[in-house]
UniProtKB/Swiss-Prot annotation:
GO terms for cellular component: cytoplasm. This is ATP-dependent 6-phosphofructokinase. The lineage of its organism: Eukaryota, Amoebozoa, Evosea, Archamoebae, Mastigamoebida. Pathway: Carbohydrate degradation; glycolysis; D-glyceraldehyde 3-phosphate and glycerone phosphate from D-glucose: step 3/4. Mg(2+) binds at D181.
Amino acid sequence: MSVKRRDHILIPKNPDAPLPSLKIEEVGECTIDNIYASPEPFVNGMTMKLSAVKNHGIERDSGEVELAGPMEKIFYNPETTKVAIVTCGGLCPGLNNVIRGLVLNLYNRYHVNNIFGLRWGYEGLVPELSEVQRLTPEIVSDIHQKGGSILGTSRGAQSPEVMAQFLIDNNFNILFTLGGDGTLRGANAINKELRRRKVPITVVGIPKTIDNDICYTDSTFGFQTAVGLSQEAINAVHSEAKSAKNGIGIVRLMGRDAGFIALYASLANGDANLVLIPEIDIPITQICEFVGKRIMSKGHVVIVVAEGALQNQKPKDLDLGTDKSGNILHWDSINYLRDSITKYLKSIGIEEHTIKFVDPSYMIRSAPCSAADAHFCMCLANAAVHVAMAGKTGLVICHHHNNFVSVPIDRTSYYIKRVNTDGPLYTMMTAIEKPK
């Protein structure tokens, strides 16, 4: 079905067409009384409506999703359940928090003792590459205080058939995958292979993207931490720019396809004069003219650049290919931006100027998460454990209107959530100077 995106919810282009199915698969009938989840109330397949959206000027519902919480009946017997956890892709604040949350909820609430981490991403599901680590409350007790992932990560696709067979051969019942869109596509492929074989193994995706660009979820863990730490970088280049004659400070922040971090950090900090994001392509001539006017009037300028900005201005014959996860490699536009600004300023007689550049990306993504993100991670892990024990599969745990919900993986992993440039977040940027 052809669909279009409204913020982070997918709806058909045709306003009269049926909505995409959001029904969650189950590996079998739940017959075991859930005596483990008390005192949380059972959700038992309760649903909530997604935000109403406008399509061709007509407001319509955008479907219902299942609440992710404890069920009165569960599918798996905790005494015999064996769980695998894998982390894939780039680092993100909160990975260890989610791992810890999964282990504590499985072990202390459902009394599941057989919990294992598969090291180095999806390589952990390939027999000749696999490194398996038992996880207990003692092992994960203080990992939330550290950045990174105790399981390690890797990029690159592996065979769904091989990974499904690994789970079967090693008697795993549940697989939790922590990762971004590429990881979720892999989880979807594993789940489809298991369903094809009619094997009752549950696959639950936990969305991990520091860029906050996964559909159907309002926010992802690590995002708030990234916004907070990004402000420190903006503060630094602001000080550098103000302390130099005709000073120009440039900060590059994460945001391969979406500019949420750049926008949130700039709005929160208040010192950015120009924000460049992938969703808006501002011609380099307008950028340079703005910088020139700002230098002449204020004596300095601060520019925040999302890493995916200015991609439409790269040389047409430049093809960088893709990374191991299949993501298109982006052109490094910073040198182009610096050279263009320098050339323009010299052309209008501003020979003396200084450009200072900061890229805090690796420092941010490898940092421990903030208190708000730590709380979010624990709640996310709690919801994931409940739906997994109930035999729900092929889903991602999303956060919508302060509720954790289950969304089919294929609805979240093949589309990218981007900044709505007609929405309130971007229009608030009108309070900040920008090119006309």
